[in-house]
């Protein structure tokens, strides 16, 4: 066997020992299971990967997703997307509720304008709640089209894109990029969290990775609903988007 599925019936008998958080922590110090405050609590966060396992996960995650998980994926569809089309995932929804989710920083308008310069068509994939202020501004540009469909349909567009871009802190486009059999170019900014799925996990020998620094971008932890941050988010100055 190339890998083992650990969620078998025997393990389920001891489910109270399972880790409850949905992310692997790739960038946090290792902790000791036996220092838990309450071994049986469901609200305890998961523990980080052990240091000895972390590099192995990161080095192999692209290969594993592309060559194994993709073939296990039951919802996949084959869609033909033009080579001159850039597909961009723009995150909306819960992170913009109330005072915004401080950790989930998103890219400004200028980022989308910069990465789309060489493309004739840009397809924006977003959630149905169009509460990201950038979306309304992008509608002014003729080359941009928009899709907010079902989870399965939207994911399959990302999965079939030859050119794909993320919008900041979000695992959705990273999963698609890791599994993709067609991806040639991936675009991202320096706004992401290393503790879970992120652009650094993509294998540069498989995909051309285009990385950008956002000058004066809203860093994770500071993404809060303020007039200053809103001004930064809708900024269209592409000179602040620097290839790195």
Task: Specify the residue positions occupied by each region the protein language model found.
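A short beta-strand-loop structural module common to alpha/beta enzyme folds
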Residues: 1-2, 126
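Donor-binding and catalytic core of enzymes assembling or modifying cell-surface/extracellular glycoconjugates
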Residues: 113-204
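Nucleotide-sugar donor-binding patch of glycosyltransferase catalytic domains
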Residues: 174-244
